[in-house]
Curated annotation (Swiss-Prot):
Lineage: Eukaryota, Fungi, Dikarya, Ascomycota, Saccharomycotina
InterPro entries in the cross-refs: Mbr1
Provenance organism: Saccharomyces cerevisiae (strain YJM789) (Baker's yeast)
Region span, Disordered: 1-20, 94-130, 198-224, 258-325
Function: Participates in mitochondrial biogenesis and stress response.
Phosphoserine PTM positions: S177, S224, S227
Name listed for the protein in its UniProt record: Mitochondrial biogenesis regulation protein 1
Pfam families: MBR1 (PF17058)
Keywords noted in UniProt: Mitochondrion, Phosphoprotein, Stress response
Family the entry assigns: Belongs to the ISF1/MBR1 family.
Keyword Phosphoprotein in annotation: yes
UniProt keyword Repeat, yes or no: no
A GO cellular component annotation in the UniProt record: mitochondrion
Top-level lineage group: Eukaryota
Compositional bias ranges of the Polar residues kind: 99-115, 198-213
Length: 339
């Protein structure tokens, strides 16, 4: 038994590795013929296999060698965390400008460094592009287009201001011209009524008419004219056309009716004609006109009343409220006032 153990121990490590490695290699070759889901559906590596292949391809194409520029070497020395402190300080002192040197040289050095150093956010590293620095130059530095862009709004403002001034002047002149025109045209008033005997003055000539026409077109539409000019003067004298009998009727209707009945027969007797032909013709005309108002099938004779003398008919007309029957409304009102 001891000899067998020694023979097992006498096998080299390489032979053992070859024996154990042949089995799994053959198994992998066999599994490659099947689909991915058939191999191991619960394996997480199946889902990330494509991403791993993309990362491997990027790493294979990535250039790990730094640039050959001396500036990059200096920057990498300062950024290297394994470098010594003295070396980093010496590199910073080399980058800083000397006291005797000018500021422009230092600025040019920093600009050249910024232009030559590779951007860590470059697209080839898989990052987003960096933002650009804002321009510090003046807005109206060179081209004439900027001047034109500034002049156009200035012109618009000037035109608007001029238009407002012209409108204000025209409105003020029109306001002043209205009383000047009507001072010569309007005559004197007495109790807000024009006097017929008076005539307008001679100042209202053709020149003033032309002036009025020219000013009337310049008036803006939105402005309303004064009410005193728009209303004619004869409207103020309408009170003289109102008869005083209306006031008496509203005050005491019974007395006014009696006065009207007493005064009416005298006027009729003075105005009635002597000829009977005219009266008969007028009566026949009234009968025909009244018969026309009725329908054709009805008998109009029953509506006709016997003829009476003209004077009696005319004298009975003023007493229109004497023999009339009172309505229910009048009786109810009278009873309510009496109680």
């Amino acid at each position: 038994m001891r000899m067998e153990k020694t023979t097992d121990k006498s096998l080299s490590a390489g032979d053992m590795n070859d024996e154990y490695s042949r089995g799994p290699i053959d198994d992998i070759d066999c599994l490659n013929f099947f689909e991915r889901a058939v191999q191991d559906p619960c394996c997480e590596a199946c889902d990330t296999e494509d991403a791993d292949e993309e990362l491997r391809a990027k790493l294979s194409s990535f250039n790990f060698q730094p640039d050959s520029s001396p500036c990059n070497a200096k920057c990498q020395q300062t950024l290297n965390p394994l470098c010594k402190i003295d070396e980093a300080l010496s590199a910073e002192s080399e980058l800083a400008p000397s006291r005797n040197g000018s500021v422009s040289e230092a600025n040019s050095d920093t600009n050249s460094i910024a232009s030559t150093v590779h951007d860590p956010v470059d697209s080839k590293y898989g990052g987003m592009p960096s933002l650009r620095k804002a321009k510090t130059t003046s807005y109206f530095a060179s081209s004439s287009s900027n001047n034109t862009t500034m002049r156009n709004p200035l012109k618009k403002c000037n035109t608007n201001i001029n238009g407002l001034l012209v409108n204000g002047r025209s409105s003020s002149s029109s306001r002043q011209s209205i009383p000047e025109l009507f001072s010569g045209a309007c005559t004197k008033k007495k109790n807000n009524v024009l006097l017929k005997s008076e005539t307008p003055n001679s100042e209202f000539s053709s020149n003033s008419l032309q002036h009025c026409n020219s000013r009337s077109f310049s008036l803006p539409r939105s402005r309303s004219r004064s009410s005193a000019i728009a209303i004619p003067t004869h409207l103020y004298g309408l009170e003289k056309y109102v008869s005083p009998g209306l006031d008496t009727l509203t005050a005491d209707p019974e007395e006014s009716i009696e006065r009207f009945s007493n005064n009416r027969p005298r006027e009729i007797s003075s105005c009635c004609p002597n000829d009977t032909g005219d009266t008969s013709s007028s009566l026949s005309h009234s009968n025909t006109s009244s018969s026309l108002n009725f329908p054709l099938g009805t008998n109009t004779n029953q509506f006709h009343q016997p003829r009476q003398p003209v004077q009696q008919q005319q004298s009975s007309k003023p007493n229109f409220g004497a023999g009339r029957k009172k309505s229910f409304i009048e009786m109810s009102l009278a009873s309510s006032f009496a109680g």
